[in-house]
């Protein structure tokens, strides 16, 4: 699929430990990676066509930046997967207009959110 003008195309997460971060996201969400050596890993798109982001171990992890929010068909299963993979829940699931969501910190301290809609999609 061709990129869309001005659409968000790629999200890069700064991480403190590339191997630990790859293991966390693979275990919690089933993400796959393209390895570019010890200094970078690309996050493979869900359909396997290209990349949607990357993990950068050379950047500083800064709290309070933009919040990346993932979608889940089963929010409670996602909470359990994050905990099982070693993530920390920083905001327990809560309701908001149209759905529910929670926030977690990955092993590097990046905060992300996960949401689900009232209808599941």
Language-model features, listed with the residues they occupy:
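Vicinal oxygen chelate
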Residues: 1-4, 8-16, 59-121
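Conserved short beta-strand elements that form part of the metal-binding/catalytic scaffold
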Residues: 31-65, 111-116
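Catalytic core of tubulin tyrosine ligase-like
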Residues: 25
């Amino acid at each position: 699929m061709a990129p869309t003008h001005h659409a968000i195309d790629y999200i890069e997460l700064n991480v403190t430990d590339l191997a630990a971060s790859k293991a966390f996201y693979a275990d919690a969400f089933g993400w796959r990676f393209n390895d570019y050596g010890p200094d970078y890993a690309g996050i493979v798109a869900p359909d396997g066509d290209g990349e949607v982001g990357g993990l950068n171990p050379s950047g500083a992890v800064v709290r309070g930046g933009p919040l990346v929010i993932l979608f889940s068909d089963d929010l409670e299963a996602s909470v359990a997967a994050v905990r099982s993979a070693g993530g920390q829940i920083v905001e327990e699931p809560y309701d908001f207009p149209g759905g529910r969501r929670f926030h977690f910190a990955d092993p590097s301290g990046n905060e992300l959110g996960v949401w689900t809609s009232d209808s599941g999609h």
